[in-house]
Amino acid sequence: MLTHLDSQGRANMVDVTEKAVTSREATAEAVVRMRPETLQLIQDGGHPKGDVFAVARIAGIQAAKRTHELIPLCHPLLLTSVKVELQAEAPDAVRIRARCRLAGQTGVEMEALTAASVAALTIYDMCKAVDRGMLIEQVQLLEKLGGKSGHYRKEEEGQA
C-alpha cells in the first residue's frame, strides 16, 4: 500500500499525529566515479575552488535539513544528528555515506538519501570544469532503524 495516496488515489502527506515518538536513524550512500586525475586533484587539495570534501559535506548536511522543501510530501523534521563522510576509493571514486538521526514520528530515510545525493552533486559541480564525464551511482538506503517497520539493512552482494 502506498501511504502517500488517499482512498481516491490523490497524493497527500501522511498524518503522523498519533504515532509515538521513537528514536530513528537512516544511513544512505552515493558513489561518484571520475577520472583518476580528478580524484588525485581532490586528494592533493589542489582544486582551485577549495576543499571539495569539506564543501560536499556541508552541502549534504544542509540538504538533509531542507529535504521537506525538495520532496513535496516529506514532513519537516527536527534532526538531532546529520553526519556526512566522504572516502576516496582509488583509483577513480568517492564514496559518500550520510547518516541522519532524530527522535520523532516519522523516518529519516529521505533525509539520508538527500544528503548523500546532494553531496555527490556538489562534487560534480565543483569538479565539472576538469571532468564532465563523472558518474553518480549507487544512491541507496543502506540501513534504517526505528519506527513501526523496524530494522532494515541492505544485504551485501552475494548474500541470500
Curated annotation (Swiss-Prot):
A GO BP entry: Mo-molybdopterin cofactor biosynthetic process
Assembly and oligomerization: Homohexamer; trimer of dimers.
Protein name listed in UniProt: Cyclic pyranopterin monophosphate synthase
NCBIfam families tied to this protein: moaC, PRK09364.1
PANTHER family from the UniProt entry: CYCLIC PYRANOPTERIN MONOPHOSPHATE SYNTHASE (PTHR22960:SF29), MOLYBDOPTERIN COFACTOR SYNTHESIS PROTEIN A (PTHR22960)
UniProt key word Acetylation: no
A GO term, aspect molecular function: cyclic pyranopterin monophosphate synthase activity
List of catalytic residues: D125
Similarity section: Belongs to the MoaC family.
Keyword Lyase: yes
InterPro entries in alphabetical order: MoaC (IPR023045), MoaC_bact/euk (IPR047594), MoaC_sf (IPR036522), MoCo_biosynth_MoaA/MoaC (IPR050105), Mopterin_CF_biosynth-C_dom (IPR002820)
Binding site for substrate: L73, C74, H75, M110, E111
UniProt xrefs under Pfam families: MoaC
Record-linked HAMAP family: MoaC_B
EC number: 4.6.1.17
Alphabetized UniProt keyword annotations: Lyase, Molybdenum cofactor biosynthesis
Pathway(s) it belongs to: Cofactor biosynthesis; molybdopterin biosynthesis
Function: Catalyzes the conversion of (8S)-3',8-cyclo-7,8-dihydroguanosine 5'-triphosphate to cyclic pyranopterin monophosphate (cPMP).
Catalytic activity, reaction form: (8S)-3',8-cyclo-7,8-dihydroguanosine 5'-triphosphate = cyclic pyranopterin phosphate + diphosphate
